[in-house]
Amino acid sequence: EGKKPGSTIDRIVSFIDMPKTWLSLTGAKVTENFQGRIFLGHDTEPESRYHFSWRERADERFDNVRVMRDEQFAYHKNYAPFAPNGQYLAYMHNMKATGAWEKYHQAGKTTAVTGRFFRPRPSEEFYDNFKDFHNIDNQIDDPLHQSKIKELKKELRRQQLKYFDSGLIPEEMRNRIIREKKTTVYAFVRDPKLYPLAKYLDYADLALERKKKNL
């Protein structure tokens, strides 16, 4: 209402905001089990302070990443830092541009920025989206940002526990346990005996520190 075609709204919008918003705009009932915030129309809700993003796959490849951001800053946690963003994907590598780019990288012609796509990732990343929209300058070690990094890391863990992040064990291991226990993913991640998530998060943090003393 009151928005012209092509206009924009100045707030963070998540995918989980969309079903709730579309139902609201059509006058349909929005039940309490819907997550997200309505961002258009008569029933617009206050913007969420934080935005949670995740990824467990990149098409046929395993790629485990979590992101917590607010309006300006974004904290990335790479649970599989050994896998580059540019790991082999059949669809992507079928494109001539990808092949040419990779050959250029293998020939040692890319820079620290243009070749990063094909290199292993750091365990953690932190970006200022106002100054660095494309997330190129990783400031995870900048002393000036440690307070904000701590805040976003704390919020990430809180939401992982609240929403039962199911990606802390391999997908096939999860499926095997579900078959053996004759249960569902929904029930499995809510059973601390089968899936002690807090411990798994702690173990993952130790591994991501990449320190010999943690072995």
What does each model-identified segment do?
Residues 17, 21-24, 34, 38, ...:
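Extracytoplasmic/secreted proteins, especially bacterial periplasmic and envelope-associated proteins
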